[in-house]
């Protein structure tokens, strides 16, 4: 009897394990099925969001590009006719101006045609996708095309706003730490990184031509020069000139700063005027200070008191040429600010230094960014330091256009 009970107990245990195993298997299958369903839902939601973003860009391109292309082509034809009736040999300077305008117009036409093609390609992929004729990877391709379209649209729109002298040139940005302290130099390094990331977001290259740190471990930046070798960089960045202040603590007034200056980086031709050799003092700081780059060249313009330098080239000769070009660019900007036609008429006592506060970056509490010139506030410090400064630049450009219109 005992044996039967024991045997029955064993049988029951085997049955229970089997039932439990079966239930566990059914639960696992259901859980797996549920996870697959959720993955499908998430993918569909992502696809819906992707489609909407692409459609928004395509719609904007369809509304904007045809009229813009028609206008640019009309202007191109008119400039070609002007060139036919103009003797290019009579006035070389005027000829260069006409040819440059014609080249710019041709470039705008090609850019708008490319924009239309990419928008049509993205639209076709969306239409095929709605018929389940393509896979998910092609939507990613359409999204990449829509990003190109969006960048091209933004570039074209900005090119119409940035019509001031030198706006279409590249930019040379000179950034200096507000003090020799470690915190200030680390903050300056963050500012440098912010502008590099901004250029990357635009799909453009920005090169740190030279960088110097006075800290023993070489961290941080005491001064740096960034070269933006793409069209309209100067127009984009002109509003960044001034003091960029990091507020570390509102209670103790702890803060540090970096000063930004902007000069044109001429993409087509260097400034076409001569500076008298007698007005220049050329020096090589590395002879006095071993911490400074060996090939650094500084050029001081005696009449204006302006000094520019270069240390990023391979030798002193190349650095001297670059420093002189930077000096000429700075003198042209000052002459424009003072509304004089000749750099020799610059009043050294009225040169505007970049001392005005451009922006405050609050790292405690709300962690926000406040633009002091335009009043714009952005409640996302991290995003701005990651290079998302488009809204800030746009606000400066709009303010400049409003002032010019008065």
Swiss-Prot record:
Subcellular location, record wording: Plastid, Chloroplast stroma; Plastid, Chloroplast
Major subcellular location class: plastid
GO biological process, one term: chloroplast organization
GO molecular function: mRNA 3'-UTR binding; sequence-specific DNA binding; translation release factor activity
Protein's UniProt keywords contain Transmembrane: no
Mutant lacking the gene: phenotype: High chlorophyll fluorescence (hcf) phenotype and plant death at seedling stage when homozygous.
Entry's Gene Ontology cellular component terms: chloroplast; chloroplast stroma
Keywords: Chloroplast, Growth regulation, Plastid, RNA-binding, Transit peptide
Coiled-coil region(s): none
InterPro entries, alphabetized: PCRF (IPR005139), Pep_chain_release_fac_I (IPR000352), Pep_chain_release_fac_I_sf (IPR045853)
Function (record text): Involved in the light- and stress-dependent regulation of stability of 3' processed petB transcripts, thus regulating cytochrome b6 accumulation, a rate-limiting step in photosynthetic electron transport. May be recruited to specifically protect petB transcripts against 3'-5' exonucleolytic attack by masking the 3' ends. Does not function as release factor.
Family stated for the protein in its record: Belongs to the prokaryotic/mitochondrial release factor family.
Quaternary structure annotation from Swiss-Prot or TrEMBL: Interacts with PDE338.
Protein name: Peptide chain release factor PrfB3, chloroplastic
Organism per entry: Arabidopsis thaliana
Encoding gene, per UniProt annotation: PRFB3
């Amino acid at each position: 009897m005992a044996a039967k009970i024991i045997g029955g107990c064993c049988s029951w245990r085997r049955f229970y394990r089997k039932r439990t195993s079966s239930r566990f298997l059914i639960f696992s299958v259901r859980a797996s099925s549920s996870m697959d369903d959720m993955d499908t839902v998430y993918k569909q939601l992502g696809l819906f969001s992707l489609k909407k973003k692409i459609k928004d860009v395509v719609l904007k391109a369809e509304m904007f590009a045809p009229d813009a292309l028609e206008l640019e082509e009309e202007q191109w034809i008119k400039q070609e006719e002007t060139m036919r009736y103009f003797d290019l040999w009579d006035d070389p300077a005027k000829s260069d101006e006409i040819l440059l305008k014609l080249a710019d117009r041709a470039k705008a036409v090609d850019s708008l045609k490319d924009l239309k093609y990419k928008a049509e390609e993205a639209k076709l992929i969306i239409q095929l996708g709605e018929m389940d004729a393509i896979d998910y990877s092609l939507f990613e391709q359409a999204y990449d095309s829509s990003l190109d379209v969006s960048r091209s649209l933004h570039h074209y729109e900005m090119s119409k706003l940035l019509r001031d002298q030198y706006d279409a040139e590249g930019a040379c940005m000179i950034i200096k730490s507000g003090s020799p302290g470690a915190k200030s130099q680390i903050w300056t390094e963050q500012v440098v990184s912010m502008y590099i990331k901004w250029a990357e977001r635009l799909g453009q290259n920005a090169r740190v031509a030279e960088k110097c740190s006075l800290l023993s471990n070489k961290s941080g930046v005491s001064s740096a020069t960034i070269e933006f070798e793409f069209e309209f960089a100067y127009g984009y960045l002109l509003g960044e000139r001034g003091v960029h202040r990091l507020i570390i603590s509102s209670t103790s007034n702890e803060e540090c700063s970096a000063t930004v200056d902007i000069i044109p980086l001429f993409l087509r031709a260097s400034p076409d005027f001569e500076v008298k050799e007698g007005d220049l003092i050329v020096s090589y700081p590395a002879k006095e200070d071993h911490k400074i780059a060996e090939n650094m060249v500084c050029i001081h313009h005696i009449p204006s008191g302006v000094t520019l330098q270069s240390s990023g080239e391979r030798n002193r000769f190349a650095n001297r040429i670059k420093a002189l070009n930077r000096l000429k660019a700075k003198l042209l900007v000052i002459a424009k600010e003072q509304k004089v036609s000749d750099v020799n008429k610059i009043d050294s006592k009225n040169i505007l230094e970049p001392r005005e506060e451009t922006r405050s970056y609050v790292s405690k509490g709300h962690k926000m960014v406040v633009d002091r010139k335009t009043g714009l506030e952005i409640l996302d410090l991290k995003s701005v330091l990651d290079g998302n400064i488009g809204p800030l630049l746009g606000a400066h450009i709009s303010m400049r256009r409003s002032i010019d219109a008065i």
